[in-house]
Amino acid sequence: MKNILEVLIFASALWGLTACSSSSSKDMEEPEKEEEKVEEVTDFYKGADISWVTEMESKGHKFYNAAGKETECTALMKECGMNAIRLRVWVDPSKHNNWCNKEDVLVKAKRAKTLGMEVMIDFHYSDWWADPAKQNIPASWKGHSYEEMKKDLANHTKEVLQLMKDNGITPKWVQVGNETTNGMLWSVQTNEQGWEIKDENGNTIITESMGHATRNPEQYAGFFAAGYDAVKEIFPDAIVIVHLDNGFDADLYDWNLGILTSNGAKFDMVGMSLYPYWAESYHGKTADQTISGCMANIKRVSAKYGCDVMIVETGMLCADEQGKLVSAQVLEEGYKQLARIIKESKEAGCKGVFYWEPECKPSQYKLGAFTEDGRPTRIMDAFKE
């Protein structure tokens, strides 16, 4: 997720940092059981990362369908046209109320299984957020050697996936790392809340470069290889994804994937993040340039590396700078952009599109797709087409 510090500023203020546990979500009723398999064979998946849902529920937030009927969030995603769910997992988020630990992930994965939806597990290999700006080493792994840390990564991967397997969950996809644009398992200086501290030039301050793609490319590849092998040990048929941001950036993909392939690391699929809003904000690109560039890159990466590609994160502007729902005109533009991404990516041979945290309130995250009172906006209609 691009620049997570900025996009989550509303969430920190709204939810606070008081201690609690996710046990209340574990006790919630699961959605009404339909059947425990995917209902139809498809070669294209429409999905969402709704990892925040149990935390939102613990705060009393409810969700409603277009008719105004209260509906469990996972079931609502299916009603909106989705057939898959993506779930992030953190190593030890005890300082952040244990959301997205393996037990919390299991709660959400069970709901998806009950509804016949496919599941993607997204390993961050950190105790909290991992993205291009930071990939902080878990506290319990700090001070370990490279070889020890490879074992840490493999053991964590197998532990989480074995829990899924023991509970009848078979993930179709597993991400080994989240937006590992600059590698994985490298740390930056942070404040007490866990947010990165930047220098006078706006750059993060790297304190440990163990798996940094520029400083230690071989070790980045080694970590990915360890994760790949760990996934296959538990789920041999799972599709292992390497996930990078800025799907329009061909040079980035060649550089990063080149590090992996030249060092013997394998992957089954390339996952891309595609955010027209962030591309305009940080790279000066129009939405058309961003989307067109990504479609071309999907075809190029697939052909060059002989693998499938999926857009595992996207999102459209849903909130203004005050955290209020944007106008109907802006929502309509978001709908058109998303509909185009879904249509053109499918035509390009892409295997699916996942929206990142669409269920979020405008006051919580500006690129969600729901209203403040938990109803899908016009943006979500793109998944029904």
Predicted regions located by residue number:
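Bacterial Sec-dependent N-terminal signal peptides
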Residues: 3, 13-39
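Boundary/entry segment of secreted carbohydrate-active catalytic domains
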Residues: 36-76
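Hydrophobic faces of well-ordered beta-strands that scaffold small-molecule active sites
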Residues: 45-50, 85-87, 119-123, 172-176, ...
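Acidic-and-aromatic substrate-binding clefts and catalytic sites of carbohydrate-active enzymes
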Residues: 56-57, 61-68, 91-103, 181-184, ...
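Aromatic-rich peripheral "rim/lid" segments of glycoside hydrolase catalytic domains that contact
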Residues: 58-62, 129, 191-205, 300, ...
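Short, acidic/polar
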Residues: 60-78, 153-163, 249-262, 335-341
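Glycoside hydrolase catalytic-domain groove-lining segments
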Residues: 71-74, 233-243, 247-323, 340-347
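Substrate-binding cleft and catalytic face of glycoside hydrolase catalytic domains
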Residues: 75-198, 204-216, 220-239, 245, ...
